């Protein structure tokens, strides 16, 4: 009953909360803007007005990008935690984000003239590579693995991929070009790239929501999922496909952003419970709002300079990660 009430509260208030977070993101930055200027630019855009140019070509794409990326990473984390029954699973910890960034680095060396859609496809391939490496290494452990052990494998794999990317960037002198994907500065959001990525975000989120009830069954354990007639392998493959689409799109659009997929699903689970038909939509909403507000905070930490968004999410995420390890030890979800 308590979780259903929170679900209603989140769903009912979400349009207002999203609108407020977007408005704040548009208003504040290196140059503060008034609400009058913002609404005037929305109603009657003046190409000769500098403030209108800032709003349409910088602030709106940045706010919309933060909302979409936060939603995508939160949903990805919720799916990974459900299908692995691992409370530490998230794209940044399980090597998915670093796999994407690694392949993008490789393609920048080998195929420097790649188009935006090609970079998106390479990012998907990299996300899949990262996931295969981590879960493949974990499957080789003779006595199985605990959530903490899987997180360690994921972290080591991520460090390896990140180190290889750094080595290539130094050797081939593309460090400046590569800094975008490893610093994740949302103020460099490309409006055209955002339009290209938006359908992929939509597809990934629709897939996740359509799988939500089946993921709930899988998260309850093998015996229960079998008794409910669920095809566990098919569900896991489809869920990971959704994760690859969402995470790959997020990394291609804005670079690596850590811990959103860890923190937001846990907060959402605390509020709405472990039913993924509620958890995934609510994680989507809260993830978008969370990253939009983190991006807003990144503008004031070292004002008037920008702080990389991953610094803000890590300040929140690292203590939360350590708290989960201390509180739950090696136990599995469910």
From Swiss-Prot:
What GO MF terms are annotated? transmembrane transporter activity
Membrane topology reported for the UniProt record = Multi-pass membrane protein
Source species, domain of life:
Bacteria
Q: Name one GO biological process term.
A: siderophore-dependent iron import into cell
What does the UniProt record say this protein does? Answer: Involved in the uptake of iron. Probably responsible for the translocation of the substrate across the membrane. Part of the ABC transporter complex FeuABC/YusV involved in import of the catecholate siderophores bacillibactin and enterobactin.
Q: Which family is this sequence assigned to?
A: Belongs to the binding-protein-dependent transport system permease family. FecCD subfamily.
**What's the protein called, per UniProt?**
Iron-uptake system permease protein FeuB
Q: Species name for this entry?
A: Bacillus subtilis (strain 168)
Q: Tell me the name of the encoding gene.
A: feuB
């Amino acid at each position: 009953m308590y979780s259903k009430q929170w679900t209603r509260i989140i769903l009912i208030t979400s349009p207002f909360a999203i609108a407020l977070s977007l408005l704040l993101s548009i208003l504040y930055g290196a140059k503060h803007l008034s609400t009058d200027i913002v609404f005037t630019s929305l109603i009657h855009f003046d190409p000769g007005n500098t403030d209108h140019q800032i709003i349409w070509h910088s602030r709106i794409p940045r706010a919309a990008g933060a909302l979409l990326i936060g939603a995508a990473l939160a949903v990805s984390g919720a799916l990974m935690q459900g299908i692995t029954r691992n409370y530490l699973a998230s794209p940044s910890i399980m090597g998915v984000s670093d796999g994407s960034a690694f392949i993008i680095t490789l393609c920048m060396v080998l195929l420097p003239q790649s188009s935006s859609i090609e970079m998106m496809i390479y990012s998907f391939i990299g996300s899949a590579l990262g996931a295969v490496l981590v879960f493949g290494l974990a499957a080789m452990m003779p006595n199985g693995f605990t959530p903490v052990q899987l997180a360690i494998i994921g972290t080591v794999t991520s460090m390896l991929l990140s180190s290889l990317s750094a080595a290539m960037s130094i050797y081939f002198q593309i460090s400046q070009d590569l800094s975008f994907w490893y610093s994740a500065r949302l103020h460099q959001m490309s409006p055209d790239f955002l339009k290209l990525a938006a359908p992929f975000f939509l597809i990934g989120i629709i897939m996740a929501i359509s799988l939500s009830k089946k993921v709930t069954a899988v998260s309850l354990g093998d015996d229960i999922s079998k008794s409910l007639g669920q095809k566990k392998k098919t569900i896991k493959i489809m869920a990971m496909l959704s994760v690859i689409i969402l995470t790959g799109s997020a990394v291609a659009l804005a670079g690596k952003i850590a811990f959103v997929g860890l923190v937001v699903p846990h907060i959402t689970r605390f509020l709405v419970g472990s039913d993924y038909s509620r958890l995934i939509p609510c994680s989507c909403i809260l993830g978008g709002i969370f990253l939009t507000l983190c991006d807003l905070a990144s503008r004031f930490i070292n004002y008037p300079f920008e702080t990389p968004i991953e610094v803000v999410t890590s300040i929140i995420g690292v203590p939360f990660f350590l708290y989960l390890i201390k509180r739950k030890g090696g136990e599995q979800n469910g």
